[in-house]
Amino acid sequence: MIDRRTLIRGGTATGLALLASPAPAAGPSVVRIWRACVDTPKTRLAMQELRSGLVALGLARDVREAPDGAGAPTFILSIVAGLASETYEIARSGDTVTVRAASEQALLHAVFDLLERQGALFGLDGTMVPPGGVRRWSLPEAGRPWRAEPAFATRGLLPWPDFLNCISVFNQEDFRAYFAAMLRMRLNLFGMHVYTDTLQPTEAYLSVRFAGAGQQAELETTATRGWGYLPQRTSTYGMGSSELFDRETFGSDAARLAADNWEIADRTAAMLRDGLSFAGDLGIRTGIGFEPYKLPAAIGDALPPEARSHPAGFADSVTAKRLLEARLADLLERYPMVDHVWLWEDETSNWDSRAKDVPISTTAFVQAHDFLRRHAPRKRLVVAGWGGFTRHFARLHQNLPGDIIFSALGDTLGWDPVAEAFGGLEGRERWPIPWLEDDPSMWFPQFRASRIEDDMRRARSLGCQGMLGIHWRHRIVDPTATYFAGAGWDRTLSARTHYARYARSQAAPSRAPALAGLMLDCDTGGAIASTYTGATTPDGHAGHVELSADYQEAFKYRENTPDPAMLLRQRRTAARFEALARLADTALERERLGYLAGFVKFLVPYCDAYRNAHALDAVLVRADALRKAGDAQGARRLVGEEGLPLWLELLPQVRAAIVDFQSVIATRHDLGQLASMQNKLVRIAVERLRLSLEEFLGDLPEEALRAQQAALVPASGAPRLFLPTRPSILRPGETLRLFVVAPGVGADARIGLLHRGLGHTDWSRTAARHEGRAVHSVALGPVEPALGVIEYRVEAEGRTGTISDPPAGGAYHAALLA
């Protein structure tokens, strides 16, 4: 082993870029890269990304920085004048491939494009290469270079905060991993909406002081009440889920480690400020904003009644105008690096305006534009809203300055087409926001590439210059998110072609076509549960059903029940996914196919439990009517004969849903979803429905209590080890904490981070620190700049053997930028 100190003392490093790979495969002995451009952090990053990518793909074993070499493939990276912004071309002559780019950013884009054409996949959850590597180059023909320019000048993401499986639970390392992923996906804009409502927790990213009062500052944790969540200790989770959490509260350290409300706000702002600054270093523009016509509860309580009684409305009062300036000034003070300030129409107004067309006030938008002109003229204002906001576009277009950008979420959770109103904004920049996933199906896998394909084609036809994708989760959204990123450059990319490409990154060549077909069936064939029903409502919107709406209680069995025909298709689809996963012949392929199969598999018992809970609720409604009519005995008999058997049937279904999902989770977002499912599915189905039964039956029979206990018993399974977050860029001299989740490995297991320079033989090992239950942590960095590229993995050595992440001798490649 090499002493770990040989990997530290790296104070001059400016970045570390991550690439996951299987065990090394054979390739050419030497490949050369030469930078025919100015030596900068970004051009060095481009070279190291190309170096690590080619090795990870199995196309090279040794990549050297040299201008040429007889018989060795050579890549020349250059920046040239005369190309439009972000454009590049890749040409080949003999053994030499020349990359010519318009800028440093375009050079990075070109390298990522080149690697993707070889088989790499850049997604929200990081980078994947085909399980067995690749054996053939994919290069342009001599004299016929590849040329690329973006289909949209603005290509971004809008990660939505508010749940346990999203940006709300981020720590520093999560923001680092996220922005590095955006860079590799060739995206260039990050947007963020902040709820400042009285009905839900007021998010801590913004925290204004006004009229002598401050505001509540929260990030969603398992100790939070709101969005259908109730406070719950993670130690109370059944089925063994508690072992996957290090302490009683799961969430961002900014919230769970803070002493009080003010420290939550300060920690949150510091964390996001660090993340946004880092995004800027990578060339990603950023923006954040709020709903000007919605006030935090405490701020609203502090306002004078005379402001609310203003004849023209509160927005035109002196108090409202001073408050808006205070909110804008607070935003700019907290995040001076942002490029855009967003003002949002609130969600309630959007849905209310469907029934009654109420014009939106322009007062706040005009005032904010003037404020930015005076105090931050380089920052641009974006006005946005939910899908119904486009109903205001024509009037707003006439009344607002032309440099304000218009944006809106797709209507009906993105299942309606991009609004025609975007086409009536001649001369104005506009960005539709398609839904990469929707929250009424928040726990489900969602394959939406075909929907995004339609949205992007229509947005281009309406003259839109940009698009941002709204999402919450990462890895399970990548089948759609990677399409969105790719189609932002390739106008011809179809969902069908994309799924085939995505499948090749997950499965061996013999199984990739079957996987692609399954994903396409889920997308276009109604093969699994979906929010979209395929129907159109009388008012012309897409019909939708909510079976796991995480913005409320999710397990909302009272409102609806799954379609029986869909349940049959879903059962068959889950069996096909599972059968395909069983055919995997390497540990890496088993993990990737098993992840997708597990997500689809848990839908079956979940929907069965949902259906039984719906039937049980109907029994309880009838029993309640009997009780109100004075027939308590009849109510008791009905619940005992019809209700209790349904509960006994759904208990093992709830258990199966949790155990199936729990067995494949691999990311921090998955951990958050597991916490949500414990809080909403398990708590409601196992605890609340039991109390509902006891209202009529009193003490339940022993068999029912035994069934309840059996449903909650910790599940046994094979030992697992995974890194929920894999940050991919380090700043000079810093260290990032990585959590390691290791259920079933045993208390005496030896867990550590292994790391070495790429091409080196010996590994250095850093021991993990136990954080609580089955959760440990390791430190990544600082890294010695002279190594150029390192690779690392986490391992657990126990009585049952050694397991690792990545599995079977694989590694995460990390290219150092010095």
Regions found by a protein language model. Give the residues of each.
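Secretory targeting signals
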Residues: M1-I2
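N-terminal export signals
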Residues: T6-A25
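Contiguous, structured surface segment used for ligand recognition
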Residues: A26-P150
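Structured segments of extracytoplasmic/periplasmic soluble domains
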Residues: G53-A60, D113-R117, A181, M185, ...
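Carbohydrate-recognition beta-sandwich/jelly-roll modules
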Residues: R100-G126, E173-F190, D197, G469, ...
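Substrate-binding groove of N-acetylhexosamine-processing glycoside hydrolases
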Residues: G143, E333, E345, S349-Q708
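Aromatic-lined carbohydrate-binding surfaces of glycoside hydrolases
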Residues: A151-D416, I470-T480, G486, T492, ...
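Glycan-association/targeting regions that enable binding to alpha-glucans and other polysaccharides
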Residues: A685-A818
